């Protein structure tokens, strides 16, 4: 989107097209993270007090977070094609984000495969918690331990033992 809409960039600063990425790609990931945190909280609430309302909130926040994640991947691929020459470079953060989203897609498949509503809600809440705990290593921890094209991805070379 930022490549289709003319977003003004500061003159004389070598950021060029990178600055536009901050208006679309980065907010998608922050939105995804916030929505997954809220979904995680409602999954815990459901397990503590099994109200269908908590399950519905947990599911819908996860769905919306997944939409933001997919949009983050798409906008990142557009930007990567422009900046790095390839939409998918196999970067650790790209791969981690794709794996994390696949884990959440499996959450929706799991919920869709169960017929008993109570069982669907309970198993879904447990899996949602699992998915949340897989999300942060996949997109925040592991990419920082390896070389990455993304900012902050210098890997273990920054750690001096």
Feature-to-residue mapping (PLM):
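Hydrophobic cores of alpha-helical transmembrane segments in multi-pass inner/ER membrane proteins
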Residues: 28-42, 99-111
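Conserved small/polar residues in nucleotide/adenosyl-binding loops
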Residues: 159-161
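Membrane-interface helix-loop-helix modules in multi-pass inner-membrane proteins
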Residues: 67-112
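Membrane-interface helix termini and inter-helical loops of multi-pass transporters
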Residues: 9-19, 84-86, 147-154
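Transmembrane alpha-helix entry/boundary detector in multi-pass membrane proteins
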Residues: 19-30, 58-63, 83-99
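Alpha-helical transmembrane segments of multi-pass membrane proteins
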Residues: 1-11
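Membrane-interface helix-boundary motifs at transmembrane edges
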Residues: 48-60, 114-121
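Hydrophobic alpha-helical membrane-insertion segments
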Residues: 124-140
């Amino acid at each position: 989107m930022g490549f289709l809409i003319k977003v003004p960039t500061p003159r004389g600063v070598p950021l060029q097209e990178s600055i536009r990425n901050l208006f679309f790609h980065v907010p998608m990931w922050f939105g995804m993270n916030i929505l997954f945190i809220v979904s995680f909280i409602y999954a815990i609430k459901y397990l503590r007090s099994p109200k269908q309302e908590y399950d519905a909130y947990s599911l819908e926040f996860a769905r919306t977070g997944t939409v933001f994640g997919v949009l983050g991947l798409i906008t990142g691929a557009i930007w990567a094609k422009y900046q790095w020459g390839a939409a998918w470079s196999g970067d650790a953060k790209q791969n981690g984000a794709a794996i994390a989203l696949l884990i959440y897609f499996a959450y929706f498949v799991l919920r869709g495969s169960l017929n008993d509503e109570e069982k669907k809600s309970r198993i879904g809440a447990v899996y949602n918690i699992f998915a949340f705990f897989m999300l942060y290593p996949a997109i925040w921890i592991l990419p920082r331990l390896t070389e990455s094209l993304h900012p902050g991805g210098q890997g273990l070379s920054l750690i001096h033992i």
